[in-house]
């Protein structure tokens, strides 16, 4: 099929839809379905194919800049991606050690080869987002960087054709019979992946994406500044992967039998864990750097605002302090029962007023309610104690008319008065006993006189 050479020989296309399906075997029809996008002069047939096929992508005029944009950051390294040496890849690329053309799959048609390359590369071929070695000097002179709008798909087509030729050569070299068929398949796929790693130098310049120079390999954690979190989640995952594997080899696509590739779920879980660890480390590094942020602006122009401290709303609780030196105004004005009712009403009013200014947080509300209830009960207890002192003072003859008597004097005088009353009580009890005995004696003497007279 001459699909890719036709695309190269055309005028610079208006755009190339990113979701063209390569699963159809008839590639001429696929090219015809996208042909109106390469000839923008035919305005009468520009939207004709969109009404006929449901797989037709949206027109360039709807959202044209989404078709030109590249990924803001390169994806993860291909060694961490699933499906490179998975059973699905082995099923797509059957290999025969004999190299014949029978049902063993020794030779591939052009459509099968395109399907295999499309499944391996996925969306990275169309999106032009291959992983490159940052220490390589050739990727800076890439044609995709020179003109990322028009020469992207032609470069991808050229890369696919070169990789197909290298893959066929590697397959012919390894065509000797082996005892195990699966081992030959894995070795062939590893050779093809090494070719991909060699060609990965033709990728996007990371200096366009990252504001930091990539040749500084002394501190890989310097990219994990708080400014790097403003780019995209993929950059965070890339930084976290570089931090977690500082001893990674320069060939990231060399597969070994002792280390099987991780599955998609495992890689996603590891990526989430590494992202969480990276977020924690960024927050820890951000804390000591808050002093220097105010003095010098950040390099990328994006900086997170520091978290504002938690503001707790406090409600003013009115406390009435009693002046013990002042005369009690409620002692003679109201009786005791009426004073208790007034105090209870006052307590309920204070509780209802204090509940209106409570904090919206549940924990703060509970603490404030407990504190308020404790204060109200304590105030009520003090009032009851004060009234008890006033009642005790009224019972002491010496302090009955002294309204400014302190509590200590009241207690001392009350103790002395109680002791004196107890002594007088004992004295009266002894006198009562003497009088009872005297009565018994007189009564007995009266009986004797009556008997003598009779």
From Swiss-Prot:
Modified residues (N6-acetyllysine): 158, 163, 172, 290, 332, 338, 386
Leucine-zipper as annotated region, ranges: 428-449
Biased composition (Basic and acidic residues): 281-293
InterPro entries: bHLH_dom, HLH_DNA-bd_sf, Myc-LZ, Myc_transcription_factors, Tscrpt_reg_Myc, Tscrpt_reg_Myc_N
Record-level GO BP terms: chromatin remodeling; chromosome organization; DNA damage response; G1/S transition of mitotic cell cycle; intracellular iron ion homeostasis; MAPK cascade; negative regulation of apoptotic process; negative regulation of cell division
Motif (UBR5-degron): 370-379
Location of the protein in the cell: Nucleus, Nucleoplasm; Nucleus, Nucleolus; Nucleus; Cytoplasm
Pfam family for this entry, one: Myc_N
Compositional bias per record (Acidic residues), positions renumbered to this chain: 266-278
Ranges of Low complexity composition bias in the record: 216-252
Main location: nucleus
Chain residue numbers at which the record places covalent cross-link Glycyl lysine isopeptide (Lys-Gly) (interchain with G-Cter in SUMO2): 67, 158, 163, 313
Function per UniProt: Transcription factor that binds DNA in a non-specific manner, yet also specifically recognizes the core sequence 5'-CAC[GA]TG-3'. Activates the transcription of growth-related genes. Binds to the VEGFA promoter, promoting VEGFA production and subsequent sprouting angiogenesis. Regulator of somatic reprogramming, controls self-renewal of embryonic stem cells. Functions with TAF6L to activate target gene expression through RNA polymerase II pause release.
Subunit description: Efficient DNA binding requires dimerization with another bHLH protein. Binds DNA as a heterodimer with MAX. Interacts with TAF1C and SPAG9. Interacts with PARP10. Interacts with KDM5A and KDM5B. Interacts (when phosphorylated at Thr-73 and Ser-77) with FBXW7. Interacts with PIM2. Interacts with RIOX1. The heterodimer MYC:MAX interacts with ABI1; the interaction may enhance MYC:MAX transcriptional activity. Interacts with TRIM6. Interacts with NPM1; the binary complex is recruited to the promoter of MYC target genes and enhances their transcription.
Protein name, UniProt field: Myc proto-oncogene protein
Species per Swiss-Prot/TrEMBL record: Macaca mulatta (Rhesus macaque)
Lineage: Eukaryota, Metazoa, Chordata, Craniata, Vertebrata
């Amino acid at each position: 099929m001459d699909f890719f050479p036709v695309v190269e020989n055309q005028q610079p296309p208006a755009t190339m839809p990113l979701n063209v399906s390569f699963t159809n075997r008839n590639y001429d029809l696929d090219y015809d379905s996208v042909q109106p996008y390469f000839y923008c002069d035919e305005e009468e047939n520009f939207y004709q194919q969109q009404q006929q096929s449901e797989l037709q992508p949206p027109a360039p005029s709807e959202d044209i800049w989404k078709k030109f944009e590249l990924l803001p950051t390169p994806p993860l390294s291909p060694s961490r991606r699933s499906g490179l040496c998975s059973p699905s890849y082995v099923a797509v690329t059957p290999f025969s050690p004999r190299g014949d053309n029978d049902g063993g799959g020794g030779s591939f048609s052009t459509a099968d080869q395109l399907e295999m390359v499309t499944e391996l590369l996925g969306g990275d071929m169309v999106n032009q987002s291959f992983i490159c070695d940052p220490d390589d000097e050739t990727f800076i002179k890439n044609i995709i960087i020179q003109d990322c709008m028009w020469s992207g798909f032609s470069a991808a087509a050229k890369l696919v054709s070169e990789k197909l030729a290298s893959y066929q050569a590697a397959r012919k070299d390894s065509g000797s019979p082996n005892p195990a068929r699966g081992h030959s398949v894995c070795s062939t796929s590893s050779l093809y992946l090494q070719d991909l790693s060699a060609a990965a130098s033709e990728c996007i310049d990371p200096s366009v994406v990252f504001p930091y120079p990539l040749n500084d390999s002394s501190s890989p954690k310097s990219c994990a500044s708080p400014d790097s979190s403003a780019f995209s989640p993929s950059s965070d995952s890339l930084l976290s992967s570089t931090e977690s594997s500082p001893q990674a080899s320069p060939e990231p696509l060399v597969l070994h039998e002792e280390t099987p590739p991780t599955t998609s779920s495992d890689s996603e879980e590891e990526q989430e864990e590494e992202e969480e660890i990276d977020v924690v480390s960024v927050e820890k590094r951000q804390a000591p750097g808050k002093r220097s942020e105010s003095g010098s602006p950040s390099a990328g122009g994006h900086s997170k605002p520091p978290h504002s401290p938690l503001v707790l709303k406090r409600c003013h609780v009115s406390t009435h302090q009693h002046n013990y030196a002042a005369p009690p105004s409620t002692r003679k004005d109201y009786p005791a029962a009426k004073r208790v009712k007034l105090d209870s009403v006052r307590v309920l009013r204070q509780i209802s007023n204090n509940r209106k200014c409570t904090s919206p947080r549940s924990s703060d509300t509970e603490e404030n309610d407990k504190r308020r209830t404790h204060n109200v009960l304590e105030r009520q207890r003090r009032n009851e104690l004060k009234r008890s002192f006033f009642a005790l003072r009224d019972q002491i003859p010496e302090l009955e008319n002294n309204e400014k008597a302190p509590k200590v004097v009241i207690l001392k005088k009350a103790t002395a008065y109680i002791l004196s009353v107890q002594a007088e009580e004992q004295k009266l009890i002894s006198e009562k006993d003497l009088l009872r005995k005297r009565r018994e004696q007189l009564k007995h003497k009266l009986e004797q006189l009556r008997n003598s007279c009779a």
